[in-house]
Each structure stands twice: as structure tokens, then as C-alpha cells.
């Protein structure tokens, strides 16, 4: 589809908080395959805090540039918890689509869950529900998670001729759209501390709004070591982010990089795997927030003590401990073998 007058109507709908740059990219990237965009915004964040109507104000000044964008206001007053606000927003958005765009395909996903153009094209005219694949990237467009988030697929495509689903179908078991390029989930994609702070404060995951996660020292630490800022040492990938070089960008990443090159990290971290594992251990300990770990993280930050000291010295100690444990294990295996042979 090249224009809003195309026979097949496709609507892209998503809730938004304050991510103007990423929203602008999503609109421009999908404009050739989507007829209309609907953005749901509220004066209350999912965490329950009062917020500015960023998108209503931004688009009001640019209505002539974006006649194919509609901003709808969602009243979240009276809702008592973060997840109720998130679900209500998504279902309000779904109700609006069904009442406004008859016989139309639609996308409902979070703003940072962006489908590829080929995913949208593959669904045009199809009267069915699907999830679409959006592997997760943290903080930069080319730092990919390697745990279960690599198979992230919570976004939904459907058709208004179908029955509405709870929560916009986000957690409904639906077939996965295959045979096309992946989209991308650009989570926490921000330029600086201020944007990261705002993301945490507005997030439905209120348990993650910890002061230590919003310090410059902490963010520099996780960026330099290219580790998950939520830790996840005990999960697949051990909280280590995978660096994707420019030559391996997919179409969506290339387009985003062309528009906002500072959303990409230039090079792979120079720290070794052992150093990065230790960094992931430190972050996991801090985020899990046992009392001692929180006191330790506060000490490092309040004293402006460099966490790099730990990352450079401890790997040597860690390596020694691992070697020692390995040697013990080998001796135990030899001992067991000898005992087994002697019994035989």
C-alpha cells in the first residue's frame, strides 16, 4: 500500500508515554504499508504518576504534516494499580479501532514493539489474529538480549471483523506470523539518563523503579560492559547483551540508524567474557536488592567508587576460584573412576 486511499485499510495503534523520536520513526518507517496511526495517551502514567500530554502537544503543532495520525486520550483516573492501567489502555485502544475502522487490519503493540514492513504486508487483507516476532534490544538498537526475550512476540495483528480479545490479545495464545523478516522490540531505547529515568518511572513494572538503576555511574557501567541492566545472570545468556555490527543490521535497524545514528553503539565491548560475567553478577545482585547488596551499591555510588576496580581485579580471583574448583572436580572424577575400576 502506498497511500491512505488503498483498498486494504491497515491501522497501526499503540499506547505512548514520551518516546517522541521512536514514535516518529515508527510512523515514517511504516507509512508506506499503514494507512492510519492511532496513539493512545494519558495524563497519568502506568505507574500512577501525573504526566504531560507529550504527544497531543507535539502533534498539535504539526497537524498539517501528519493528517494520518490520531491521538486519543485515555482516562486512567480511578484505576488503582499499574497493570490495570496498562490493560485498560490497551483495551480502550482496541475498542476505538473496532468502532472507527470497519473491515480493517490492525496492529496493537507497545510503541517500542515495531513490526517489519514485510510482516505488515504479509497480513494485509487476512482476517485472522497473529502474534509477530520482535526480538528484544536493550538501550541501543544493536544490543540484543540472548535469553527468552530474543523470541519476544507480544504484539498482535488482527482484523476488525473478528471478536475482540482481552488485553488486545497480548497474552492470548495465537499463531506466530512466520516466513517474513523479524520486527524489533527496542526496549529502554534512550539517549541519556533523563530518558532512562522517565522510562522507569512511567513503567508498569513499578518494582524496577529503584534509585540505583537511575544513576549515571550505574548506566555507564552496564553500557560499557554491555550487560542487561536488570541483571539476569541466572538466565540463558547470563545477562550478556549481543552486539550486532552495522553490516548485519536488518532493514528496520538500518532505517532507524539512518534516522537516529546515536541510538546505536559503535563497537563491541573490549571487556572479556569473565569480566562481563562478573559485571552481570554485580548488577543481578543490586537489582534483586537484598539488603546487603543495596548497601553495597549505595556505597559505591555515594563514594563515587569505581565499579571498574571490581571488574578488573575480581576476574583474576574468579578465574583462580574456577580453576581450583575445576581441578577438584577432575580429581573427584579420577577418584571415582579408580574406585569403580577397583570394584570391577
Give the location of each predicted region.
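Active-site-proximal specificity loops/subdomain of glycosyltransferases
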Residues: 45-104
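Conserved catalytic core of nucleotide-sugar-dependent glycosyltransferases
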Residues: 113-205
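Short loop->beta transition adjacent to catalytic acidic/histidine clusters or analogous donor-positioning motifs
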Residues: 10, 30-47, 66-71
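Short beta-strand-to-loop acidic/aromatic patch adjacent to the donor-nucleotide binding site
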Residues: 102-114
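C-terminal catalytic/acceptor-binding lobe
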Residues: 135, 170-290, 312-317
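Short, well-ordered alpha-helix to beta-strand connector turns
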Residues: 34, 66, 103, 126-127
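Membrane-proximal basic amphipathic "stem/tether" segments
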Residues: 266-344
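N-proximal low-complexity "stem/linker" segments adjacent to membrane-targeting elements
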Residues: 1-32
